[in-house]
C-alpha cells in the first residue's frame, strides 16, 4: 500500500494540470510504484500466491493504460516510459 505522502509526490510529478489525479500518466506512475513494492514483498514472501495474483492484475491494468496512452498521446507515452524506465 502506498503512503499518502508518496502518492502525492507521484501525482505532482506526473500530473498534466493542477487538479489532475486521474490521467493515464498519473495512474501508470502510481501502478508502477505499487508493482515495485509488491516485487520487493515477493523477495521475502515467495509463496504469497494471493498477492501474486494481485500483482498480475496490476501489471495487466498498467499494460492496458500504456496501450491507451500510446494510441491517443504518443508524446506522453514516450515521456512516461522514459521517466519510469518501463520499456525501451
UniProtKB/Swiss-Prot annotation:
GO terms for biological process: translation. One of its GO terms (molecular function) is structural constituent of ribosome. One of its GO terms (cellular component) is cytosolic small ribosomal subunit. Disulfide bonds: none annotated. Pfam families: Ribosomal_S15. It comes from the Bacteria. Gene3D superfamilies: 6.10.250.3130, S15/NS1, RNA-binding. InterPro entries: Ribosomal_uS15 (IPR000589), Ribosomal_uS15_bac-type (IPR005290), uS15_NS1_RNA-bd_sf (IPR009068). The keyword Cytoplasm does not apply. The keyword Zinc does not apply. Keywords: Ribonucleoprotein, Ribosomal protein, RNA-binding, rRNA-binding. One of the primary rRNA binding proteins, it binds directly to 16S rRNA where it helps nucleate assembly of the platform of the 30S subunit by binding and bridging several RNA helices of the 16S rRNA. Part of the 30S ribosomal subunit. Forms a bridge to the 50S subunit in the 70S ribosome, contacting the 23S rRNA. Belongs to the universal ribosomal protein uS15 family. This is Small ribosomal subunit protein uS15. The gene is rpsO.
Amino acid at each position: 500500500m502506498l503512503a499518502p505522502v508518496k502518492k502525492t509526490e507521484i501525482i505532482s510529478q506526473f500530473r498534466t494540470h493542477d487538479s489532475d489525479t486521474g490521467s493515464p500518466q498519473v495512474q501508470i506512475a502510481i501502478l508502477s510504484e505499487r508493482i515495485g513494492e509488491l516485487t520487493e514483498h515477493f523477495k521475502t514472501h515467495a509463496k504469497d500466491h494471493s498477492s501474486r495474483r494481485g500483482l498480475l492484475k496490476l501489471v495487466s491494468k498498467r499494460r492496458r493504460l500504456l496501450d491507451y496512452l500510446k494510441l491517443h498521446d504518443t508524446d506522453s507515452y514516450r515521456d512516461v516510459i522514459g521517466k519510469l524506465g518501463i520499456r525501451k
